[in-house]
Amino acid sequence: MVQWQCNLRVSWRMQLFSLLAHGLLVLLILLAPWPDGYMSVWLGLVTLVMFGFIRSQRNIKSRHGEIVLYNENHLRWQHREWQITKRPWVLKNGILLSLRTTEGKGPRRRSLWLASDSMRNEEWRHLCHLLLQHKNWQSDRLM
């Protein structure tokens, strides 16, 4: 039986946060006083931060689509069945879910950040209510 379902959108707040965080890192690298001969280190660091930014944006953009919560610890997302393995970390702007697949293919474990702006306010409040009312999280692990 479906307790909650939603069509997740890409979170513009998470995209903006990623842009600001990576931009700040690049700015710090550029403004740091580098001695002569360290240009290769400087360029390497800027390149790593830029690739990290691209990877972050791809990850944020991949967190969309239909998600269905069947019960307190079982959900369907991206056409796969997942089990919530730890107590969800609920904040004002999002929920962090630790997931383990119940199917044998693909990555076995995944963390899923559900941003509050990736769904309607009513869906967000209902999901928070469902996850916070579940009292049987056994020492942060489900059996």
From Swiss-Prot:
Subcellular localization: Cell inner membrane
Gene Ontology terms describing biological process: antibiotic biosynthetic process
Reported phenotype of the disruption mutant: No effect on aerobic growth on succinate or in LB. 90% decreased synthesis of prodigiosin antibiotic, decreased transcription of flavoprotein desaturase PigA.
Induction context: Transcribed under both aerobic (with succinate or glucose) and anaerobic (with glycerol with or without fumarate) conditions. Part of the sdhE-ygfX operon.
Cytoplasmic compartment residues: 1-11, 55-143
Residue spans, topological domain Periplasmic: 32-35
Keyword Membrane: yes
Top-level taxon: Bacteria
Membrane topology of this protein: Multi-pass membrane protein
A Gene Ontology cellular-component term: plasma membrane
This protein's pathway: Antibiotic biosynthesis; prodigiosin biosynthesis
Annotated S-S bridges: none
Keyword tags: Antibiotic biosynthesis, Cell inner membrane, Cell membrane, Membrane, Transmembrane, Transmembrane helix
Pfam families found in the cross-reference section: Cpta_toxin (PF07254)
TM ranges: 12-31, 36-54
Recorded domain comment: The intact transmembrane domain is required for Pig production, its replacement with 2 TMs from an E.coli membrane protein (MalF) does not allow Pig synthesis; although the chimeric protein is found in the membrane it does not self-associate.
Quaternary structure annotation from Swiss-Prot or TrEMBL: Interacts with itself, SdhE and as in E.coli FtsZ and MreB; other interactions are shown but require validation.
Function: Required for production of prodigiosin antibiotic (Pig); overproduction in ygfX, sdhE or double sdhE-ygfX deletion mutants leads to nearly 10-fold increased synthesis of Pig. Overexpressing cells have somewhat altered cell length depending on growth phase. Does not function as a toxin; overexpression in the presence or absence of sdhE (the putative antitoxin) has no effect on growth rate.
Protein name: Inner membrane protein YgfX
Taxonomic source organism: Serratia sp. (strain ATCC 39006)
Lineage: Bacteria, Pseudomonadati, Pseudomonadota, Gammaproteobacteria, Enterobacterales
Gene, per the UniProt record: ygfX
